[in-house]
């Protein structure tokens, strides 16, 4: 607990403030202005003191308009004080005058605190789960006045002020009250409201005035390159998504169809002049497109405020503020509601691993390493030149956990995909020997980060049933998606990076060589059910010179398109939830750049249109067939039919789940049609072809089996003879008797 700061006496025998206090107020260095300014008892009377730069005269009034006394100018810089005629301590308004005119202002120092002892208790304990209702800027009514309550955590600061256009960005005007025990500073500023830009002016423990800081809890920010926070009220949206939310509250997402369309909101589409679409414009275009294409969820790359476009949002300076690039925060609420009404979920890419060191951000926030570790071996990320959150500090953990809860509560998001989890879990991540500090047990595991992730997941799942968390975790850390009470991290799902790597490596090989790499596609099934997996073909695979998914496929142009369609068929038939980055659903040719829109004109060309139709039909099949999604995370839902035909590069398995017919998935990854190919099947009878990625309507050769094959029993074996089209995946569904 912090010791109370010793302050000078508030007045002498005559009621006047000590000269040292006056000088400190005028200089803007006083750490406890509430001990000097405002209304104070002196003897049996009341005195008022205020600092009003540029005023020549000041008269005090009650909020009801009763004159309370003229104040004397103690210092030409604008310090006034005087005895009041009122008998009861209360908030005051001042009428100020100079040669240029007169104006009114309400005294922020005549109001009592807004936060209470219970807030102090839970904040100090790190257990406050509604910090976003207490910290930041909130428009409220307080002691008879309307204004904005500001609160910020800066425990090592000597002085913190709110600055904005309402006080000419003068840090002497609205210095905050230090609550001491918690390190929270607060002030209620009357007569201002939503829409006002502001920052915090902080004097660090060494007495140095820091660069102006944005509010860590700001709900809105200025459009870059401006960096101020903006006073904003919570979304005032009339939500109509109860049916959607009720469905997912009562669902087990592991047994639901989850097909995710990963989107960068700033480049999916743009205006003709290259400017961003607003949230409302995105809602009008993106939501119908996602519905038509059959995806169940949109996953946005980070939309929290960030200063640098090429960071794609992964270097955020405003975790609580939807980026101003796309309009007001209410617009994002309308987008989510519109998506929900259309049956589409919204997942946010969330970045609690690190933050940029921009001067207006969290780095050295109060003049010390506050949100980050002081030791760069734990507090600085060498790959990204960013600061790493101090997960061992309860206030930092509380800041991050509250942010996860904030998006679920205020914006109704359906999930959080947590970025760079591996970098959080390992103290030696991307570090050489001597560049990292072992944990208390001598190991490389970041036990503090583990504890944070477990707490975050427990709170999200505990407070918001129906919201899922997804880990981007690229190592073999065990039990990422196991419950915390079983020793897991508590995520709902984990990205299957091995699937992505192995399959892309396989399909980059010329078909004649694939027989030597057969294990690339079979190995994944040895661990496919060790976690609840999402199969990601994400933005990471189409940037930094990696090309596009189409360009990664081996062969000439026809083979590339055929292989990509077959790959998608393979993936949609493979156990695990699906994720596809925007543009890859129609085989974008150019590598993705955040600076330009997708090449939508490609949909006018048949090969590209065919890939889009393939993805659309796969999505509808995946959603409508329980066998393809009901046991995505359970080994009982998968059985190999053909695992060892490396010579022909053929793979086959069957998917099944309660409530639906079994579906066989058969892939031929050579350009050679395999006629009279015998495939074992689990049941005799007719099997209907429900998709063939080589179909002519997709741009394929049109080879197939006339829509049906028949499996016959020969002794104990059941099989069907069929044609396997070149570079194709087909799915067969057992026809009910």
Swiss-Prot record:
The active site is at 419 (nucleophile), 472 (proton donor). Keywords: Carbohydrate metabolism, Glycogen biosynthesis, Glycogen metabolism, Glycosyltransferase, Transferase. Pathway: Glycan biosynthesis; glycogen biosynthesis. Its EC number is 2.4.1.18. One of its GO terms (cellular component) is cytosol. It comes from the Bacteria. Coiled coil: none annotated. The keyword Transmembrane does not apply. One of its GO terms (molecular function) is hydrolase activity, hydrolyzing O-glycosyl compounds. Belongs to the glycosyl hydrolase 13 family. GlgB subfamily. This is 1,4-alpha-glucan branching enzyme GlgB. It comes from Mesorhizobium japonicum (strain LMG 29417 / CECT 9101 / MAFF 303099) (Mesorhizobium loti (strain MAFF 303099)).
